[in-house]
């Protein structure tokens, strides 16, 4: 069980991220340390990565870590990734080094509305995979949503180990719910999504939430599934349809 994006400023409020990180380390198998949302320089980011590794091991000596960040937070071409890894590992003892299992690498993924607008960088992919092998880490790319299946297969063929896909599956679930809502329920769901504000980071400045209703809902519907107001309008009996849709997409990717 992996917790993505632990660290400073990763929640709804700006904070140092320590309290939630230490709780996560007690209950997850792997926790992603990502200080880059707050600390943009390699120097600051590696220092806080080391700091969080040591704090995590104090509360759970068996915890494992994922390090690095995604392109949407900070662009990390191979030369910067190499510098980050070198400085991080030079600051750790052997036990601390062994706690790192995953490395986030980048090859051109970026989400905007319901699309992946990233430009594939094969050189970045190959060189970053080499770095992951050099340090004995499992590589992972974030924001793999909405990519063409053949491109995902191509990345795997080059040596990509794992890829994060989440909003794409959430959108599948959202569409199934939307198609089964009454008109009144759609209005309530849209209002819930609008008020959440979770759509704002995924759209351009000229996006009009009043006219692009379905786009807004598709972008952030999955963020409000745990809201009590959603529970009041949630359609029943759709679990099998949702599971089938998600399973078919996963099977397509893994072929």
Model-inferred region functions:
Residues 1-3, 45-64, 87, 121-139:
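Alpha-helix-loop-beta-strand connector modules within alpha/beta enzyme cores
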Residues 1-59:
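Active-site beta->alpha loop and helix N-cap motifs at the rims of alpha/beta catalytic domains
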Residues 4, 67, 155:
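Conserved, mostly hydrophobic/aromatic
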Residues 7-9, 33-42, 64-80, 101-117:
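Active-site-proximal beta-alpha loop/turn segments in soluble metabolic enzymes
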Residues 10-22, 75-85, 146-158:
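Catalytic cores of alpha/beta
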Residues 26-29, 99-100, 133-137, 154-163:
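Glycine-enriched alpha-helix->loop->beta-strand junction motifs that scaffold or abut catalytic
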Residues 29-36, 116-120, 138-144, 164-167:
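Catalytic beta/alpha-barrel core
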Residues 138-146, 150-255:
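Flexible, acidic glycine-rich loops studded with aromatic residues
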């Amino acid at each position: 069980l992996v917790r993505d994006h632990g660290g400073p400023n990763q929640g709804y409020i700006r904070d140092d991220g320590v309290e939630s990180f230490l709780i996560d380390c007690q209950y997850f198998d792997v926790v992603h340390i990502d200080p880059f949302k707050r600390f943009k320089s390699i120097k600051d980011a590696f220092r806080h990565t080391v700091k969080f590794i040591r704090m995590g091991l104090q509360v759970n000596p068996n915890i494992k870590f994922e390090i690095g960040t995604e392109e949407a937070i900070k662009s990390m071409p191979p030369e910067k990734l190499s510098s980050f890894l070198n400085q991080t590992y030079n600051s750790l003892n052997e036990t601390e080094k062994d706690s790192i299992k995953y490395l986030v690498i980048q090859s051109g993924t970026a989400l905007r509305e319901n699309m992946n607008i990233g430009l594939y960088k094969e050189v970045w992919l190959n060189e970053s995979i080499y770095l992951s092998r050099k340090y004995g880490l499992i590589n992972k790319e974030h924001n793999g949503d909405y990519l063409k299946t053949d491109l995902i297969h191509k990345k795997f063929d080059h040596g990509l180990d794992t890829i994060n896909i989440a909003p794409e599956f959430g959108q599948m679930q959202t569409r199934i719910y939307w198609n089964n809502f009454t008109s009144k329920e759609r209005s309530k769901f849209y209002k819930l999504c609008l008020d959440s504000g979770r759509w704002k980071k995924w759209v351009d400045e000229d996006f009009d939430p009043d006219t692009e209703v379905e786009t807004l809902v598709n972008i952030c519907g999955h963020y409000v599934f745990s809201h009590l107001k959603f529970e009041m309008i949630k359609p029943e009996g759709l679990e099998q349809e949702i599971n089938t849709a998600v399973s078919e997409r996963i099977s397509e990717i893994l072929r």
